[in-house]
From Swiss-Prot:
InterPro entries: Ribosomal_eL44 (IPR000552), Ribosomal_LSU_eL42 (IPR053708), Ribosomal_zn-bd (IPR011332). Belongs to the eukaryotic ribosomal protein eL42 family. This is Large ribosomal subunit protein eL42. GO terms for cellular component: ribonucleoprotein complex; ribosome. Confers resistance to cycloheximide, an inhibitor of polypeptide elongation. It comes from Candida tropicalis. Keywords: Antibiotic resistance, Cycloheximide resistance, Ribonucleoprotein, Ribosomal protein. GO terms for biological process: response to antibiotic; response to cycloheximide; translation. The gene is RPL44. One of its GO terms (molecular function) is structural constituent of ribosome.
Length: 106
């Protein structure tokens, strides 16, 4: 379990700042895939009609976790940047700090 604070003081390379400022931290989430990307258009065209599945469906998944990506937004100039972290199974934004001798809770 990785516990990350909701704010972080880090360098902002936006035009207005170019100094260390407080950034708001959120977790990156992938957007919805576009129906009009070239690969998707080609795939849909190939799939239409008779003939079943035309491309292989991938089954041999190797990884059990994804890398955590943080989205940092400057509170002064609203510039956003992304910061990749190491792999982990659980992430918590702004959770309580660990106490000595306490058990972990999920």
């Amino acid at each position: 379990m990785v516990n990350i604070p909701k704010t972080r003081n880090t360098y902002c390379k936006g035009k207005g700042c170019r100094k260390h400022t407080i950034h708001k931290v959120t977790q990156y989430k992938a957007g919805r895939a576009s129906l009009f990307a070239q690969g998707k258009r080609r795939y849909d065209r190939k799939q239409s009609g008779y003939g079943g599945q035309t491309k292989q469906v991938f089954h041999k998944k190797a990884k059990t976790t994804k890398k955590i990506v943080l989205k940092l937004e400057c509170t002064v100039c609203k510039t956003k940047k992304q910061l990749p972290l190491k792999r982990c199974k659980h992430i918590e934004l702004g959770g309580e700090k660990k106490q000595k001798g306490q058990a972990l809770q999920f």
